[in-house]
Amino acid sequence: MDYKLYDFDNKSILRSGKRWFPTMGEIHYSRLPHKFWKEELCKMKAGGVDIASAYVIWIHHEEIEGEYDWSGDRNLHGFILAAKECGIKICLRIGPWCHGEVRNGGFPDWLLHKDFEPRTNDEKYFSVVEKWYAQIYEQVKDFICRPDDE
């Protein structure tokens, strides 16, 4: 069959040529003990959720500048694996600023003491954010949706 995986018309999104009305939920993995991730994600799937969005909250992963923690309840890779096992797609909200009711909008405390203003076009700020995004990429590179993925 020759069609794009995702398309749309004036009525809906099409996935693999069929009408699809995605339902999305929210789960903050770094605020939930990792032993419950799969259970909660499978409950979401059973409730009709197709996609779960999740903040990657910077302050939860780099409390100390240059020291990243992707273990335990902060294991983004493991969280995505759990979602995959439950049949839920993940939409990451990588910020760097987040509105997840978290201190500093998720910015690490150390970032606020730098000689630049966060959330601006300052090159120094962009440089720090680029390092953060590179860390996220290392956690998710095996799961990035490509045009031929289901």
Feature-to-residue mapping (PLM):
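Active-site region of glycoside hydrolase catalytic domains
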Residues: 2, 85-94, 98-150
